Amino acid sequence: MEKQTGELDLEFFLNSGFEKKQCIKCGSYFWTQDKERNTCGDTPCDEYTFIGNSPVPKSYSLSEMRDAFIKFFEKRGHKFLKPYPVVPRWREDVLLVNASIYDFQPHVTSGIVRPPGNPIVMSQPSIRMNDVDLVGITGRHLTSFEMLCHDSFNTKDKTVYWKEETVHYCYDFLTEGLGIDGKLISFKEKPWSGGGNAGNALEVFVRGLEVATLVFMDMKEDPNGPYEIDGIRYSKMDMRIVDTGYGLERLTWLSQGTPTVYQAIYPDIIQHVMKNSSVSDIDEEFLSEVVKASVMKEPYEESFVISQLEKRYPDARQRFEEIKKVRDVFLMIDHARSLMHMFAAYVIPSNVKVGYLARMLIRRAYRAISNTGYRGSLMDLIRMNHEDLKDIVPDFPEQFVSDVLSIEEEKYRDVERHGTQIIDKMISNKGKLSLDDLVLLYDSHGISPETVKAYLETKGMEIDVPDNFHAIVIKRHEKGETEKKKYSDYPEIETRTLYYDDPFMREFTGLVLFSKGNEIILDKTAFYPEGGGQPWDLGYFEYKGKRINVVAVRKYGKTIVHTLDGEIPQGVRVHGVIDWERRSRLMVHHTSTHLLLGVLREVLGEHVWQNGVQKDVEESRLDITHYRKIDEETIRKIEERVFDLIREGREVSVRNLDWYSAIDKYGFRLFEGGVPLTPKIRVVEIQGVDAEGCGGTHLKNISSIGVLKIRKVEAIQENIYRITFSAGVPALHLFQESYEASYGISTLLKKPIEEIAQSVSELSKGYADLRRSLAEARRRDIENRIANAKKIGTPGAEYPIIEADDADIGEISRIAHSRKVDLIVETRIAGKFKYTAISPSKKARDMIRKLFNADPEGNDSMASYINEYSE
């Protein structure tokens, strides 16, 4: 980052006895009240000196530390916000919340949406998977944690507070709130970047432990910007945002001084596991030294840690191996906590996106449970974690979690049973396995690298498993959907959206403000542009007595562009007519999609989320998350509930609400259909059934749908089901077509319609019986022909030969192998003779060579030769 001279030379530092120094080890600048300090406080420049020597007078539990932080800042005018889910439904570019600022990116940080409070304080559960391989090993790494924050959002017109107040608040909380000696605190200068924003930052350390980061976000990504961080250029933005992050778990650990962070935050669960497993005790003295050594080299290296321990403990290597089970205890509890947060957000394990990350944690936890001999279950650990955090995760779907885990455990056991067969197959194809093969085995089959390594050792083979193996795999799955920006060369003309003013408007008159070729932009339009899974409207414009058809309608920002099959000049008024039959069917299908989604949640469970949608004129499709097959009985139940609601005639309302007012009322279900970057959310609500942010056109009452019929339900990928349906007139046509087909069948069978299913079933059974009889007769015929076949060859090498059709080769081969008979089959293809040797004794190629003096095609079980001479 280009140096911004003095931007962190704050009055608070200068007036509070701080000195700015340069670390003698890493060269970073830092602020301290300790005249003797010459290192920045960060590891490896400083060691962990708080273990067994806490600088906090009182020992805090996790909940006590959270309460202390929140109350401290509430007293100082900060609005408390409840935590968001760990799955950011309000964003499409990331899979999990990694930090509290994710709650406000990009809608608040861009200035589009007003913050829900200013300033605010909260404790946000977060999940980071980049260090998953180090969990349990270093004593400090976690996959899930709570980020405490006190943030302010400053605009050009109003400054709430900025750098001076932020640092002052931090210092006061640590000293007055927790009782830490100010001389033990150091503030290290370091630039920060993330989520398209950046700014100067201070990292806060106490006795070697980083407890907070204070970010002063005032920059945005800009390829021409004057500032650079990690190869990305930035420029100043209009807003100045205080983005702080205090590690709740680390502050709790600091207050207790335990050997590891796990013992500070999971004391009761650890005790439970040790009482119910083969792990009897913890060598706390040695474990403390392991943790201290692990921070002295980045990235973590086991060999380095052992070498440091051997300076003090002659048997360090042996003791290091002995504590690995303890580390598995820490790992499975940590992973259970992350899973508790994921399941509370209704994540369904799968092979893609956030579901993949959940499955990875589940399988790592199962392996740790196996290694430690824990006699409980993963569900027990998740339940205990929820008990510890029920204040911040009040609603926990226990039955959903139990159902999902039972399915996942069976899949895991299946991998354990059949994994070696898959490994053997890969070895036979490739010989030596590589890192890419390890990743493939884990990614596609769920076989852990530890399992592969152990199995290869039994076969005298070796493979290196990198310490960051899971981080390598995660990089393939961690990115969310990055929205493709729509670029256009059109002028920025705001087109009034008549289809919102009156969705039932069929005709209108507008002024052409821009024309180029066969494209025009009007001052207003009733033509709906493509968006939200709803296709664009069709219709025509009347100009000079001619009809010019509209073939496409697209929206770029606030500009709506109409593509025509002719040309209309700029500056003229035109009369537009919507293809109303098409639009009305699209409106029926769009409203039906919302209705169906609400009913699916009601019938299948709250875990159902929209995963994709496409509306059309004749039928529409809705993709949902679900973990069990949807059977015919369930489909009938869904259709009947939809029909009941249609008969009730629920109203459909459309309102434009402020972001946070809408979220407070409806929750994050609002974003099932997408995330609008607008100051307000257009909420479409079907009374008591569904409420979503939606930009489509809708009916006024669901009674106008008339009828809905599910045409097909299919699993399009693991735990994603596609429901194809028709509503309104297309559904009526579907019923009519079905009746006509049924009537035709009943006429042919001379049976009433209500009896045709039974009649067809009987016919089908009779047909199946006939096929079996024919197959049996065919088999007996082939056996007789083999038994009575003449032989060809020379004495000692004679083989039966039979004539047959090429289509019979498969059946002949099965019979020959069952009877262990080597034979020749003669077939005729395009006037040529083909001779096929079938040999259960594995000498088919040799048979062709000896009998026909020819080079055969095929293998030792079946080989063939074609005589090029025609009959």
Curated annotation (Swiss-Prot):
Catalyzes the attachment of alanine to tRNA(Ala) in a two-step reaction: alanine is first activated by ATP to form Ala-AMP and then transferred to the acceptor end of tRNA(Ala). Also edits incorrectly charged Ser-tRNA(Ala) and Gly-tRNA(Ala) via its editing domain. It catalyses: tRNA(Ala) + L-alanine + ATP = L-alanyl-tRNA(Ala) + AMP + diphosphate. The keyword Amino-acid biosynthesis does not apply. Belongs to the class-II aminoacyl-tRNA synthetase family. It is found in: Cytoplasm. Consists of three domains; the N-terminal catalytic domain, the editing domain and the C-terminal C-Ala domain. The editing domain removes incorrectly charged amino acids, while the C-Ala domain, along with tRNA(Ala), serves as a bridge to cooperatively bring together the editing and aminoacylation centers thus stimulating deacylation of misacylated tRNAs. GO terms for biological process: alanyl-tRNA aminoacylation. This is Alanine--tRNA ligase. The gene is alaS. Keywords: Aminoacyl-tRNA synthetase, ATP-binding, Cytoplasm, Ligase, Metal-binding, Nucleotide-binding, Protein biosynthesis, RNA-binding, tRNA-binding, Zinc. Its main location: cytoplasm. Binds 1 zinc ion per subunit. Zn(2+) binds at residues 590, 594, 694, 698. It comes from Thermoplasma acidophilum (strain ATCC 25905 / DSM 1728 / JCM 9062 / NBRC 15155 / AMRC-C165). One of its GO terms (molecular function) is aminoacyl-tRNA deacylase activity. Its cofactor is Zn(2+).
